[in-house]
């Protein structure tokens, strides 16, 4: 995927009190949270990071007296030091007018947990202001402090490092299907699903003021945004190239920042308002009932209950491949547990296997991880018994979370519903 968003200088961590932050990840992590890691892994990592920041803060306070510097370098992430794989976080503060403010060092209070509820809850999401993920964060946690992140994995890291208390990330769309990247990240990281929210999506074709759609040569947006508007773009008779970028609002920001007049973006009406663009076509999604499902992630799971509808998400694998899937499904069917989703993803640890169990021959099958959502709480005995039976057939089983279902009613998306603002 080609990223058109401007890059930022890595290797610094800065903040501004009581402001939102943009988190940028430079480089790749050399160590990720594996399947078999425990919750103590990230707890100890956060403690190590806090200790390093505290010691560096003392040393930098001495040097700042001589050179006036107000930022410093965090040389380790997740407690892992040195090496080319070190990943740095670059926090760029900004206010509602999108202007960069004076930088201040990141304090230990920024790595401490925020209250569970209320206006101080810090919620990470992927994208920039105006993204649908920001709207989902506002719907899930009204009056929260939104923390934009440039990549999905950075949102996971923000919660693991206590920079954010929650992350709100999309997992599937009613038109575009599953966001496979986030399913892989759910397995790689040790965060827990603590809730879900369904957001109606209302796409607009937006461009700089005065631009006519007849003169467009390119349309940019998130891959899901392009897929959800493919037929409508064709019906409009636009002979344009489709180009994927990291997020919908980021596409609008890129056009505005670079004054590009031959390119339009697929984004929300709020993104057009934020970045000073005009709406050329309104409601261009192929289906008016376009909904994206987001999950809320936290460091600790919530306590399952039975006083309201709950949903549980699991992931499992078996060394014999798909032949056990029928047995797994039967464990839920016999207990009248409804499944709402089944998703298969290649097993990265064992990508392929020989058909012959004696490891001879050339024919090969893919190994898969299976993600399942079912309508039951882990506080119910039928759910516990079902998973006990599933565990007999699988070589790996993990509960990603048991959480309240989003039962709010919604109607086909409209401009008013999508462009509403949130106190973030």
Swiss-Prot record:
Pathway noted in the entry: Amino-acid biosynthesis; L-phenylalanine biosynthesis; L-phenylalanine from L-arogenate: step 1/1
Region (Disordered): 57-77
Span of chain positions assigned to the transit peptide in the UniProt entry: 1-24
Enzyme Commission number(s) of this protein: 4.2.1.91
Record's keyword terms, sorted: Amino-acid biosynthesis, Aromatic amino acid biosynthesis, Chloroplast, Lyase, Phenylalanine biosynthesis, Plastid, Transit peptide
An example Gene Ontology biological process: L-phenylalanine biosynthetic process
GO molecular function per UniProt: arogenate dehydratase activity; prephenate dehydratase activity
Enzyme class: lyase
InterPro entries for the chain: ACT-like_dom_sf, ACT_dom, Preph_deHydtase, Preph_deHydtase_CS
Catalytic reactions of this protein: L-arogenate + H(+) = L-phenylalanine + CO2 + H2O
The Prephenate dehydratase domain, residue ranges: 122-299
Tissue-by-tissue expression: Expressed in roots, leaves, stems, flowers and siliques.
Location of the ACT domain: 313-404
Subcellular location: Plastid, Chloroplast stroma
Biased composition (Low complexity): 57-71
Cellular component, GO, one term: chloroplast stroma
SUPFAM superfamilies: ACT-like (SSF55021), Periplasmic binding protein-like II (SSF53850)
Null allele phenotype: Lack of Phe and Tyr accumulation after blue light irradiation of etiolated seedlings.
The protein's assembly and partners: May interact with GPA1.
Function: Converts the prephenate produced from the shikimate-chorismate pathway into phenylalanine. Together with GCR1 and GPA1, required for blue light-mediated synthesis of phenylpyruvate and subsequently of phenylalanine (Phe), in etiolated seedlings.
Other remarks on this protein: Has no detectable prehenate dehydratase activity.
PANTHER family: AROGENATE DEHYDRATASE 3, CHLOROPLASTIC, PREPHENATE DEHYDRATASE P PROTEIN
Protein name: Arogenate dehydratase 3, chloroplastic
Organism: Arabidopsis thaliana
Lineage summary: Eukaryota, Viridiplantae, Streptophyta, Embryophyta, Tracheophyta
Gene that encodes the chain: ADT3
